[in-house]
Amino acid sequence: NAATILSFFISEKILTKKQTENFAQKIGSDVILGLNRLSKIYYSDGKIYEIKKSLKYYLVLVKPNFGCSTRKIFSFNKVFSKKQFSKSKKNISKNIIFNSKNDLENSAFKAHPKLKQLKNQLINWKKAEFVRMTGSGSTLVMYFNSNETAKNALKTFKRRLNNSWCILSKVI
């Protein structure tokens, strides 16, 4: 992935941090999120806040065999909520993350009803703490408190969703 390559260029002193950030912005707005291992909140105005306190979640990422056009999803979206996070909050708790939302989900679901069906199927698997869509889609992320539970979910959904890409990860 692009962020990994750019991180390598920083570590080998091929590019400066500023040059790397410029390239990341040109490649895609979310590339900058992967330049280091800190968890981040990406604001709608393009600003990024790094979370110092590590949150312990184990993740199962599920990507269906179709993608979502960012341009199309944003064109469907009419309402954007106000910021839920302020930069003055030093500690982002699990409760804040749990209660957050992605304004683009409803637009993605209108464009791709199968994506909504997939999210409902993931939510109905009660062992996940919650399920979120990444950016403008189409990847869905299941959040778990336990690595073992996440591994079991991965096995289950790899069998059930043979047309989807599924992988295990964790918040680092």
Show the residue positions of the predicted features.
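Glycine/serine-rich anion-binding loops at beta->alpha junctions
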Residues: 1-10, 130-144
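Conserved, helical-rich catalytic subdomain that frames metal- and/or nucleotide-binding sites
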Residues: 41-130, 145-163, 167-172
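DPxDG-like acidic metal-binding loop motif
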Residues: 1-24, 33-35
